[in-house]
Amino acid sequence: MFSMTVAAMRRHRIAGAAALAAALIAPGAAAAAAAAPAAQASVSRSALASGYGGSRAGNAALNWAEGHARGCWYSYGGSSCSPGYDCSGLVMAAFGHGAGIWLPHSTYSMLGNRHLHRISLSQARRGDLMFYGSGHVEINTIWYHQTFGAHHSGQRVGLRKWSPWWHPTAAYRVW
């Protein structure tokens, strides 16, 4: 089960993650993220312990992605299993088909979308979007340090663990 405490998660956050993520945010998105109510990130103790507590939209999107896109090939610019998904195409399809929220097919455009609300990495839950400094996006799972996404050419859509050189720099919840 989930044995990492919230305090331990905070200690493992990357130094400077906020600065890196701020560099990714399109003009106007920072103000929208800052204006989001603080209550959006609050979750119950049982939700923290279980790893759940993300939005309904995020849970629905991850369920759709795991059921419909797992095992499909990566294809740059793709947004369906044939020919394949790229990272933002998978997120767009998962939230569109799974939750009825159609996000743009571009990682950078997603950051400025009104449905995304910035949260700290330690507050990330199942279904939240995890952005990487390289312009990559994946969907968070309930497992600490693991995301679901379309990674790169030659790989299939699926789970990926974080590593010292590959980890998110920003997290967003979709409402």
Task: Describe the residue ranges of each PLM region.
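Residue-level preference for alpha-helix termini and adjacent loops
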Residues: R13, L24, W73-S75, G84, ...
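Short, surface-exposed, polar/charged, turn-prone segments marking secondary-structure boundaries
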Residues: A93-G96, W102-L103, G158-R160, P168, ...
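...with weaker cross-activation on analogous glycine-rich loops/strands in unrelated enzymes
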Residues: F2, G100-S163
